């Protein structure tokens, strides 16, 4: 669980602090999810307070060690981030200050994997560069699956680690350790981005210099905000025709509503792109060497960009003045900030989630990637500067701050599972303590004791064995039976961490192996895929006697069918795609239903009275009892609620789940001998079905946020295609050589759209879809769906 970005500290003492310290602490400190010491320290903090605090902490350090004292304070008082940072052991503080846990996220084809390939090359992690769609048949390092290399897309997030050497102002070299995750861009694999951002401290958001902010950029922005992840931005593809980096900067400000400003200005663009000018140090930076591995810096700024440099530096300072107090004060006094002041302000604002600095370059052309790596060091937080909260099960799940000290009891989160040749591989982020090979850990979900047989650091599909991993690091372990989102501790603490957001599937397919002898391998594959991917669901429909797989889109399911063939040698037959329809009640309907079966032996008797009505929102269903006088006992009401939720799983209209329906039971009757929990459960289900049909109910269909991009010459053809599918066009943008249209379309109407779009645009158009909301079906479509469902039921009864 992450804390809100800004909350005031409670007016309580850190175990044993004097009241004078508490008062000052309450007045002068704020807690943020991401905060450096510079962000948190109050300029008005009294020296007396600091003296008392230092003395008190020194006494504690002598008595029982800083780590234990801070753990005690964290458990009881929501310890401030400043106290954690300032009381780190110097060795530990030095280690953490040189760690960055970052992800690379962006829209499809923005160059994430190409950029990651350069990062690995420039940090010395790989010895040669290979392209995503390269002619050498090797493929990018981070695309380790054959399918990824064939299709030229990232399907699974891939983790690696590398070391970056950065020179400080004095020319001294400092080595920084990066734990890096490359994520997919396609919306069908959004869970990979979701779970990566859940455990990362910062991110690089990549944008295309031609297209700017695109549909999946908006999705990635939403995910970063969900987990309060600070980000720097990198405008890639500066060598492409039509490149306009400042359009991307404006779109970050306007579309994403996030203050942004360029910290670099490109020297040339398109095929004349040469390098960049650093607006903070006012130096021109060029790449040299066969792969751009050498950097050349000069204070001579080209004449052709001098006016742009002055204008954009002024814009940078103005934007920072809006989000940072120190720069605002200098701006009012009309004083020019120094290089150190600008860097400190950008760091504060970025970590405080109020700003994103924008870098520029071209990964494919090997230009200006290294300055972006310096930006990761300068502006993204280290693990000690990030506030992560756990829930203490021993204290009614009260929030408690995790402290990144290696000497404290272990707390780690399993965020991804993957099958390998050596068994199940579990990716873990260690938030507190140390994870050691051979140690026993406890799964907080089921209190199961587990031994850690092997710990590895991942480099795409390669691994490097290690004996231990400290707080703030990411690793993988073998032979651990767990689920994605499980919390691991060493058993001393009753902590658990909240899991990541998992979107609901929107599309299903019936599937079966072509050959019955492959049934065992088919079942094994299905179990593995479900364990690895929370958005991939497998169900068995008893009525149709079919296995159904559900996921985020056609590509998502096609990939798993293909993986079944390649990895398990199982050819499958699939049915046509099935839309995840929903049903909902129309009007308020009262019911008085009696279930009575008495034929000599034990009978059934249950009477339920009440009403059903819409909740007003198309989300969870609600059951409520308003019994007065005990006409139905508590255990039977429990059975009524169970019956209601079972009935909601399979609606009366077309057999799909019910949304936005409320049932209230306010009266009823029981029989001394014939009433049972089963009879009340059945009576509630019968009352539900009858009342639901009388309420003028509706079938709901999923509406998809659809974004189509194609060359401008095909605009009319694309609009015509969407209109034929009854799409609602919300907006469109026309660029120099391409246009983008934003629309809401029913998922049912979009089947086959991919091939039609290719035909209409000579293979040059592309589109993305993301679930938006549920909407009532057109009456004719609802009528057809109900008729089809009734016919299928009648056919089954004949059998």
Swiss-Prot record:
The keyword RNA-binding does not apply. GO terms for cellular component: mitochondrion. It holds the Pfam family EFG_C. Signal peptide: none annotated. It comes from the Eukaryota. Residues 1-34 form a transit peptide. It is found in: Mitochondrion. GO terms for biological process: mitochondrial translational elongation. Belongs to the TRAFAC class translation factor GTPase superfamily. Classic translation factor GTPase family. EF-G/EF-2 subfamily. This is Elongation factor G, mitochondrial. It comes from Aspergillus oryzae (strain ATCC 42149 / RIB 40). The lineage of its organism: Eukaryota, Fungi, Dikarya, Ascomycota, Pezizomycotina. The gene is mef1.
């Amino acid at each position: 669980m992450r804390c809100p970005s800004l909350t005031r500290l409670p007016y309580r003492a850190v175990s044993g602090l004097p009241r004078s310290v508490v008062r000052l602490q309450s007045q002068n400190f704020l807690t943020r999810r991401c905060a450096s010491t510079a962000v948190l320290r109050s300029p008005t903090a009294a020296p007396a307070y600091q003296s008392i605090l230092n003395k008190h902490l020194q006494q504690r350090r002598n008595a029982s060690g800083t780590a234990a004292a801070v753990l005690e304070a964290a458990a009881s008082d929501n310890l401030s981030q400043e106290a954690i940072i300032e009381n780190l052991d110097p060795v530990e503080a030095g280690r953490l200050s040189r760690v960055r846990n970052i992800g690379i996220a962006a829209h499809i084809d923005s160059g994430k994997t190409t950029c990651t390939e350069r990062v690995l090359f420039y940090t010395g992690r790989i010895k040669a560069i290979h392209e995503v769609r390269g002619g050498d048949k090797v493929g990018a390092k981070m695309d380790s699956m054959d399918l990824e290399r064939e299709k030229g897309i990232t399907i699974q997030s891939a983790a690696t680690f590398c070391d970056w050497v950065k020179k400080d102002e004095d020319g001294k070299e400092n080595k920084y350790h990066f734990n890096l995750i490359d994520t997919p861009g396609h919306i069908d694999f959004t869970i990979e981005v979701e779970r990566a951002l859940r455990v990362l401290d910062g991110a690089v958001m990549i944008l295309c210099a031609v297209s700017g902010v695109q549909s999946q950029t908006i999705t990635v922005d939403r995910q970063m905000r969900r987990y309060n992840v600070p980000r720097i931005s990198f405008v890639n593809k500066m060598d492409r025709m039509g490149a306009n980096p400042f359009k991307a900067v404006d779109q970050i400000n306007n579309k994403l509503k996030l203050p942004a400003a360029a910290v670099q200005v490109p020297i040339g663009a398109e095929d004349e792109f040469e390098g960049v000018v650093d607006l903070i140090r006012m130096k021109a930076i060029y790449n040299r060497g066969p792969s751009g591995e050498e950097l050349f810096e000069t204070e001579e700024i080209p004449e052709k960009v001098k006016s742009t440099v002055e204008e954009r530096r002024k814009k940078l300072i103005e934007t920072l003045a809006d989000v940072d107090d120190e720069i605002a004060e200098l701006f009012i006094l009309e004083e020019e900030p120094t290089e150190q002041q600008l860097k400190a302000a950008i760091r504060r604002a970025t970590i405080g989630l109020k700003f994103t600095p924008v870098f520029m370059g071209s990964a494919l052309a090997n230009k200006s990637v290294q300055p972006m790596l310096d930006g990761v060091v300068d502006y993204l937080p280290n693990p000690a500067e990030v506030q992560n909260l756990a829930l203490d099960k021993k204290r009614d799940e009260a929030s408690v701050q995790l402290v990144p000290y290696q000497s404290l009891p272990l707390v780690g989160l399993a965020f991804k599972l993957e099958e390998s040749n050596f068994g199940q591989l579990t990716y873990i982020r260690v938030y507190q303590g140390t994870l050691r090979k051979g140690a026993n850990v406890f799964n907080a979900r089921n209190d199961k004791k587990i031994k850690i047989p092997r710990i590895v650091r991942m480099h795409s599909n390669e691994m490097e064995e290690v004996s231990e991993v400290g707080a703030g690091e990411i690793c993988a372990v073998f032979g651990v039976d767990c689920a994605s989102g499980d919390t691991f501790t060493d058993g001393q603490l009753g902590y658990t961490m909240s899991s990541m957001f998992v979107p609901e599937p929107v599309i299903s397919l019936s599937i079966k192996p072509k050959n019955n002898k492959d049934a065992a391998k088919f079942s094994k594959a299905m179990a593995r895929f479900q364990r690895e991917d929370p958005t991939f669901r497998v169900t068995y429909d008893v009525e149709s006697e079919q296995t159904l797989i559900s996921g985020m889109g056609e590509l998502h399911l096609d990939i798993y069918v293909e993986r079944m063939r390649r990895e398990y040698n199982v050819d499958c037959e699939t049915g046509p795609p099935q839309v995840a329809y929903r049903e909902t009640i129309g009007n308020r309907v009262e019911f008085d239903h009696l279930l009575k079966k008495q034929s000599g032996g034990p009978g059934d008797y249950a009477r339920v009275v009440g009403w059903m009505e819409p909740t007003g929102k198309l989300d969870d269903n609600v059951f409520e009892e308003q019994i007065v006088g005990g006409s139905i006992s508590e255990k039977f009401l429990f059975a009524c609620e169970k019956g209601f939720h079972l009935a909601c799983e399979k609606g009366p209209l077309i057999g799909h789940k019910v949304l936005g329906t409320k049932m209230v039971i306010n009266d009823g009757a029981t029989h001394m001998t014939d009433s049972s929990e089963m009879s009340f459960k059945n009576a509630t289900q019968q009352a539900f079905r009858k009342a639901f049909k009388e309420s003028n109910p509706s079938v709901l269909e999923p509406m998809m946020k659809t974004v189509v991009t194609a060359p401008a010459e095909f605009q009319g053809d694309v609009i015509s295609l969407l209109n034929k599918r009854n799409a609602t066009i919300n907006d469109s943008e026309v660029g120099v050589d391409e246009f983008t249209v934003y629309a809401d379309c029913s998922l049912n109407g979009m089947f086959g759209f991919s091939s039609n779009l290719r035909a209409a645009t000579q293979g040059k158009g592309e589109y993305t879809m993301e679930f938006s909301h549920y909407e009532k079906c057109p009456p004719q479509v609802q009528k057809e769906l109900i008729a089809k469902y009734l016919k299928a039921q009648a056919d089954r009864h004949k059998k």
